């Protein structure tokens, strides 16, 4: 027994001290870049649920203005969000995600006060009754006082009163919009892709009227289900700017108009109706008249399922303590990771040109982006006489293929908004975690 104890003791002390450099496999910078480029290729296709790049089609001479407006407003929102974090010396709120948060539920009200009506919009043909005109009037930011249950075949408008939460605006951690999709047995299509937009208040008809948030594919005839959307940025904006609270728009993924560059005409498309039905938004009038069985069933399934917001806020005392803690951490890391010339773990610049580096022509905007990557050695920060070092040395001896020391990995990442084409159809998507902003040893 004493022999075994002595043997273990000697083993712990005689094993060489862990190396000062990371045991993670090392690569030269060219290899790092090639691997990063290939990883981005797979990441983009995977996030778009594509097994291979779309077939090459001739690029349009000009992208429709309404598509560019949506892309620009979504891109600007992400840039504003990143700028706010940088100015406040903030990271992703990993600490706040750990602690308990106060949750508030805000139900959709049945009515909103009357506001200024939109100016009449006409197309090149002079028509004001097309879907394009109607949509422009509803989305221009000056909404009529009509109840949410007013039936619109192509889209739905949802609004919320968050004025009671304005005093806690800085405490907002996350906001979720939840809406219950009802089963629609009479739907003409079995599946539709619905999109959620934030309605913007525009000063004129050239300004964007909506900002893309997210999309989901739903089965219209299937059993009902809750749909959740992250609307943190929109609600945060409403809490700080009350006049910008114009609600959300739920619509189909299809352009309402076709823009012809040669003569600047806008031709309204025959849009597919929104077959998905939502509790608390779609009244019984959306179903066939006289079908009392369907109406009764719909009312029962809609009970207690009003569209609502779930707001998660940190208590003020906890937010203050965590903000000071977070800023101290940022200051410590900044000097280590962002030197111009450094062999240790730090952020390395890498610009991806979609055509040059990936051979892709189907992404229209942006032409490329700063993807960046993390590389460098991760020295141990503990001394050689600590028991922790000895345990790691023993572990490294028993598991020579494993990494007992930290590796240089990404820490803060930001999303990327892209405008791309599938055939002749423009699409706008927000890809999460595409831009590396800082690194750490982990």
UniProtKB/Swiss-Prot annotation:
Cysteine-cysteine disulfides: 337-346, 345-408, 374-439, 378-441
InterPro entries to which the protein is assigned, alphabetical: Cystine-knot_cytokine, TGF-b_C, TGF-b_propeptide, TGF-beta, TGF-beta-rel, TGFb2, TGFb_CS
Gene Ontology biological process: activation-induced cell death of T cells; ascending aorta morphogenesis; atrial septum morphogenesis; atrial septum primum morphogenesis; atrioventricular valve morphogenesis; axon guidance; blood vessel development; blood vessel remodeling
Signal peptide: 1-20
Gene Ontology molecular function terms on file: amyloid-beta binding; cytokine activity; growth factor activity; identical protein binding; protein homodimerization activity; protein-containing complex binding; signaling receptor binding; transforming growth factor beta receptor binding
Keywords: Cleavage on pair of basic residues, Disulfide bond, Extracellular matrix, Glycoprotein, Growth factor, Mitogen, Secreted, Signal
A Pfam cross-reference name: TGFb_propeptide
Induction: Both isoforms down-regulated during muscle development. Up-regulated after denervation.
SUPFAM superfamilies: Cystine-knot cytokines (SSF57501)
Residues with glycosylation annotation: 72, 168, 269
SMART domains tied to this protein: TGFB
Tissue: Expressed in cardiomyocytes.
One GO CC annotation: axon
Family listed: Belongs to the TGF-beta family.
Oligomer status and interactors: Interacts with the serine proteases, HTRA1 and HTRA3. Interacts with ASPN. Interacts with MFAP5.
Record protein name field: Transforming growth factor beta-2 proprotein
Species whose genome carries this gene: Rattus norvegicus
